[in-house]
UniProtKB/Swiss-Prot annotation:
Known role: Catalyzes the initial reaction in the xylose utilization pathway by reducing D-xylose into xylitol. Xylose is a major component of hemicelluloses such as xylan. Most fungi utilize D-xylose via three enzymatic reactions, xylose reductase (XR), xylitol dehydrogenase (XDH), and xylulokinase, to form xylulose 5-phosphate, which enters pentose phosphate pathway. Also major aldose reductase in pentose and D-galactose catabolism. Reduces the pentose L-arabinose and the hexose D-galactose to their respective polyols.
Protein name: NAD(P)H-dependent D-xylose reductase xyl1
Annotated residues for binding of substrate: 112
Catalytic reactions of this protein: an alditol + NAD(+) = an aldose + NADH + H(+); an alditol + NADP(+) = an aldose + NADPH + H(+); xylitol + NAD(+) = D-xylose + NADH + H(+); xylitol + NADP(+) = D-xylose + NADPH + H(+)
Inducers of expression: Regulated by carbon source. Most abundant during growth on D-xylose and L-arabinose.
Pathway it works in: Carbohydrate metabolism; D-xylose degradation; Carbohydrate degradation; L-arabinose degradation via L-arabinitol; D-xylulose 5-phosphate from L-arabinose (fungal route): step 1/5
Amino acids binding NAD(+): 168-169, 217-226, 273-283
Annotated disulfide bonds: none
Lineage: superkingdom: Eukaryota
Pfam families according to UniProt: Aldo_ket_red
PANTHER family per UniProt: ALDO/KETO REDUCTASE (PTHR11732)
Gene that produces this protein: xyl1
Native source species: Hypocrea jecorina
Length: 324
């Protein structure tokens, strides 16, 4: 089945249900993308930092060559990493990422985090990661502001390298600031969003301003448990939640479908991933039923304001308090 779409403020239609590419292993990434296209996915959410964009591009190229899709049928999303925030570095790295994907433009290109770090040349290390030395040294840029970076992002649109641009992991004040200085308004805001971290005020702000919200990590701690993260292990998996399981039984759906529908029913886009064809189909088919007001209220009561995707949860990073 095809995903419903959401209209962006840039005028383009974005599939509401896409396929996330974080932690998709390089060895299987091309096949995973190809199989997801066969299953009906059209939006693919990647990033420089995921380290698998070449393989993603191979999967896309094979699907186009085999006649499964045309380029214009796909909606390819990628992100600008923090070490490339300098105005003169944005376009060159975008062109490199486009080359990895074997495409001429991104449908959507995002600022990955609201943090400008010192430049690391791709010939030294790519993806560069968080640390300047590749080990432990954090070096904030002393010259580059988010406004300057956004100006360079806008020029990507002017040059046809990106059709829409957006932001990721921004909190409310950064969104407010962007709305003041932006010539081209952010089309989307991608955030960690699940029943344990609902961020209702941030979601409301974005939607009120005509910015589409995309939820990542819709299944909460599950993806972070694989990283042996203590914070993720401190709470029960959402798939095992009695509330979510009861709603899945009530609607004769899987817990994953309930978690995804909780977002999509509220106008939020989702980007789940899986390597299993049957689960690919289930995740894509999450908009064919509705949760009632009582269901939504029960999930709203699950909010713990627990964030998993922040640097201080991965490593000792006392200079990387991005969500303070």
């Amino acid at each position: 089945m095809a995903s419903p779409t959401l209209k962006l403020n840039s005028g383009y239609d974005m599939p509401q249900v896409g396929f996330g590419l974080w932690k998709v292993d390089n060895a299987v990434c091309a096949d995973t993308v190809y199989n997801a296209i066969k299953a009906g996915y059209r939006l693919f959410d990647g990033a420089c930092d995921y380290g698998n964009e070449k393989e993603c591009g191979e999967g896309v190229a094979r699907a186009i060559k085999d006649g499964l899709v045309k380029r214009e049928d796909l909606f390819i999303v990628s992100k600008l990493w923090q070490t490339f925030h300098d105005e003169d570095k944005v376009e060159p790295i975008t062109r490199r990422q486009l080359a990895d994907w074997q495409i001429d433009y991104f449908d959507l290109f995002l600022v990955h985090f609201p943090a400008a770090l010192e430049y690391v040349d791709p010939s030294v290390r790519y993806p560069p990661g968080w640390f300047y030395d590749g080990k432990s040294e954090v070096r904030w840029s002393k010259t580059t502001t988010l406004q300057q970076t956004w100006g360079a992002m806008e020029r990507l649109v002017d040059k046809g390298l990106a059709r829409s641009i957006g932001v990721s992991n921004y909190q409310a004040q950064s969104v407010y600031d962007a709305l003041i200085y932006a010539r081209i308004k952010p089309a989307t805001l991608q955030i960690e969003h699940h029943p344990y971290l609902q961020q209702p005020d941030l979601v409301s702000l974005a939607q009120t301003e005509g910015i589409v919200v995309t939820a990542y990590s819709s299944f909460g701690p599950t993806g972070f448990m694989e990283l042996d993260m203590p914070r993720a292990k401190s709470v029960a998996p959402l798939m095992d939640s009695p509330v979510i399981k009861a709603l899945a039984d009530k609607h004769r759906r899987t817990p994953a479908q309930v978690l995804l529908r909780w977002a999509t029913q509220r106008g939020i886009a989702v980007i789940p991933k899986t390597s299993r064809p049957e689960v690919m189909a289930q995740n894509l088919d999450n908009t064919s039923f509705d949760l009632d007001s009582e269901d939504l209220a029960k999930i709203a009561d699950m909010d713990l304001n627990i964030r998993f995707n922040k640097p201080t949860n991965y490593f000792s990073a006392n200079k990387l308090y991005l969500f303070g």
